[in-house]
Amino acid sequence: MLKLYHCAETRSMRSLWLLNELQIPFELIDMPFDLSVMRSADYLAVHPLGRVPCLVDGDFRLFESGAIAEYLCERYPESDLGRLAANPERYEWLQWIHYSETMAVHAASLVQQRFFIAAADRSAVVAKLEGRRLEKAVQVLEPRLIDRDYLLRSGFSAADIGVGYSLHLADRLIELARFPNVARYLERLRARPAFRASLPQGSTHAISWLPLSEPIK
């Protein structure tokens, strides 16, 4: 059986959401958001950086959420969540799988600057720069979603899961209402049962560990 190491509403939510969409049996190892656990010798033997996600399939281990998405979609092609080699949308699909991490990098940097770095070490310049970069990354999606419900013309895919998680995070950091097509898209994604099943029990759409902050001005 597949096994997923996961921390609530971190990037590993992409992998959990995808597994829930696939509706296949798997074991969830719910890790605390605690460096003493994540950097323990036991977990470093699973993931060399002590991060999530990590997918275990028998003797095979895989980390990086984009790689896990490609692996699962190729292993379970009947799901139609991937776009395999012969599919004309294959490279668009790959583009958005990887673009989701472009978005997440800026969001993660902004989270560090606003909440996790000691106040004396924070940089208002870096925070503003990363906020603008995140806004630009989201803005790219706005025209894409004018005439479609999902990123690909053919419909929902794992690419929407990758980008959807990044938007779920961005929603706590910037004003998504400025991008109405994107805001409606995120609402559609959040309405999916597999998305809701990937949230911590009792959670709302807000990321449970991330305080609400003032949007970038």
What are these regions (language model features)?
Residues 202-217:
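Acidic/histidine-enriched, glycine/proline-rich intrinsically disordered or flexible terminal extensions
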Residues 1-125:
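GST-like domain detector, emphasizing the conserved glutathione-binding G-site
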Residues 33-34, 159, 203:
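Conserved beta-strand edge residues that scaffold enzyme active sites
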Residues 100-191:
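GST-like fold's C-terminal all-alpha helical module
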Residues 73, 166-167, 199:
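Active-site-flanking alpha-helical
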Residues 19, 55, 68, 141, ...:
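Residue-level signal for nonpolar/aromatic packing positions in well-ordered secondary structure
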Residues 84-85, 197-205:
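Short, flexible loop/turn segments with low-complexity composition
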